[in-house]
Amino acid sequence: MAELTLSINFTQPIIHRELIRILSPAYQLMPGDTLNLTIALSNSMVHSDSLLIVASAINHLRSNGIEVLITIHGQSTYASRINFYSLIGVPFQENYIRRNNAGRFIELKSFDRDTLYPLQDELNMILYQNGGINKEVLQLLFYCLGEIMDNIIVHSGLDGGWVSAQYYPNRQEIRLTICDNGNGIHHSLTTHPESKYKQASEAEALDLCIQRGVTNGEGLGFGLFATSQFILKNDGDLLIYSGNHYLLATHGNYEIHEGDFYKGTLVSLRINTDVPVDYKDIMPAHHTLPDDYDFFIDKYFGEDNELW
């Protein structure tokens, strides 16, 4: 049986692509193999989406019969508060009072068909309650969040995925990451019997997935198109990582690069909460997005009362 040793240092800034580079060799392990993983933490801010990438990978490996032995150096009350320790099976004594998330974040969570829509509602309610986020941003995020999470249920070949969200009011930004360890975009796009894109390469599949109307035969092929257009017009950042390639959209443009292997699909967004985007620049004519969002708000909060 093989044994692999890896180390992640969260006491220094680390981007998602670097995390994937570190974790990539673990996806080659076989049932019965062992991963010795050392994680360095501190109470300086670590992003929840970075912790999500690690927690989801650990759970994936364990579910496939790989023994994951974890050593933690240092500690992070923030990591504990968003349930990182419990998700990776490491005991942690919480010497603090767990306060409400104050509409700033959700704990790291997995979701499946049964919890998909309640979790979407929870995320949208948290963002609405802050009151400091542009309404046009909230409307498009409401749509894109549902589409991305639904894509995982439909296309990953698994029962569900993982999500993290954090709002930074001082920076006027939201960081949102949704991921799974399933089939990946290339497999989904090229192997479905009704797909028109069976000859696409992995890099081409990433490019195709953000084009309007591209689908493997399931769905309308609009969710990632709308998401990418939203981020480009919002001047935010978008990372879509699947297999050995990733798409990076930033500063109004996007590029596709070859990278280290990631098992499944990762969609990570950084959204500027003060940069409005007109839904009519993205959505089909006569789309009911504003009405759909207002209906959602009325459902949970009663009349909007012109808070906006």
Per-range role (PLM):
Residues N9-G89:
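Amphipathic alpha-helical interaction surfaces in cytosolic regulatory modules
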Residues D180:
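Acidic ATP/Mg2+-coordinating residue in the GHKL
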Residues M45, L123-G146:
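Conserved short strand/loop->alpha-helix "switch" segment adjacent to the catalytic nucleotide/phosphoryl-transfer site
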Residues N183:
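Glycine-rich G1-box
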Residues M1-M30, G89, E94-I97, Y197, ...:
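Flexible, glycine-/charge-rich segments associated with ATP-binding catalytic modules
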Residues Q172-L176, T265:
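Short beta-strand element(s) in the Bergerat
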Residues A55-A57, K135-N170, S228-F230:
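Conserved ATP-binding N-box helix of the HATPase_c
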Residues G103-I133, H192-R212, Q229:
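Helix-loop-beta hinge of the Bergerat
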